[in-house]
């Protein structure tokens, strides 16, 4: 029986699979995977996913739907994703508010111009994806370094997309911090401007300090203190939401990752959340 509340999660990465398979039930509430990396996987990896899904709830965070792209949405991939989400009874599916294809795959998450036209374009694609997937999507605020054309602020753009598409938000707290440092806005004010009812989950991760005014979202290090503080503010404003610790490389021993998820749970409890028994 999975916990009724999915409070604390860890990103499912193939490099962590042996340790995750040996992890005690209850160490985290759920695991988050990218469906693209697992849909067609068999062998030891496929067996490992099936074993983990019997012990932990699964959520999904997509990588390649390219909601902001110009090419038509890949309906075959959407159908594969829908079947994957149904098979593993996925409660939360999210995708990046970005594009990653332009006459071919770009292998990166590119920011969308902050314009009214882009709002209408991406919102229509989100609605189409939600219809085919037969569930709501939460879109994630991304980190970006070269700002796209901006007829409105990032905050106004996100607000408009959420309203026009009638979708949810996966709030990446580290990305808010990174963008605030890099583009000179106040992270707390950014959180205060987001619609509370739309936040369906959160991410926390580590970043690299290139300079005081240049942070790089790497997912390759421990979560920094400023991000923990911002996460506490996010929990205070939006309540306890399913939160994933993302770590994509430079994997430490699993015990170190679980120490971070334990801290995540402590922050949630301080904000009024309750740990599942």
From Swiss-Prot:
It holds the Pfam family MbnB_TglH_ChrH. InterPro entries: MbnB/TglH/ChrH, Xyl_isomerase-like_sf. HAMAP family: UPF0276. Belongs to the UPF0276 family. This is UPF0276 protein PP_2398. It comes from Pseudomonas putida (strain ATCC 47054 / DSM 6125 / CFBP 8728 / NCIMB 11950 / KT2440).
């Amino acid at each position: 029986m999975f916990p009724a509340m999915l409070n604390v999660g860890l990103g499912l990465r193939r490099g962590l699979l042996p340790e995750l398979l040996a992890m005690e039930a209850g160490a985290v509430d759920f695991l988050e995977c990218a469906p693209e990396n697992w849909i067609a996987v068999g062998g030891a990896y496929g067996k490992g996913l099936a074993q983990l899904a019997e012990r932990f709830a699964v959520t999904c965070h997509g990588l390649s739907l390219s909601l902001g792209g110009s090419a038509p949405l890949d309906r075959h991939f959407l159908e594969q994703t829908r079947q994957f989400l149904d098979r593993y009874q996925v409660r939360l599916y999210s995708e990046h508010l970005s594009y990653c294809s332009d006459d071919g795959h770009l292998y990166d998450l590119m920011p969308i111009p902050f314009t009214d036209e882009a709002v209408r374009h991406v919102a229509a694609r989100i609605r189409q994806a939600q219809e085919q997937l037969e569930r709501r999507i939460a879109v994630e605020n991304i980190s970006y370094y070269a700002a796209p054309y901006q007829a409105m602020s990032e905050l106004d753009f996100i607000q408009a997309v959420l309203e026009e598409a009638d979708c949810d938000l996966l709030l990446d707290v580290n990305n808010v911090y990174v963008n605030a440092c890099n583009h000179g806005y106040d992270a707390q004010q950014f959180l205060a401007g987001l619609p509370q009812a739309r936040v369906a989950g959160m991410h926390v991760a580590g970043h690299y300090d290139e300079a005081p005014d240049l942070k790089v979202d790497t997912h390759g290090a421990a979560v920094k203190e400023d991000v923990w503080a911002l996460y506490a503010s996010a929990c205070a404003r939006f309540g306890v939401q399913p939160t994933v610790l993302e770590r994509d490389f430079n994997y430490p021993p699993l015990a170190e990752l679980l120490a971070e998820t334990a801290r995540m749970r402590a922050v949630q409890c301080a904000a009024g959340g309750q740990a599942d028994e």
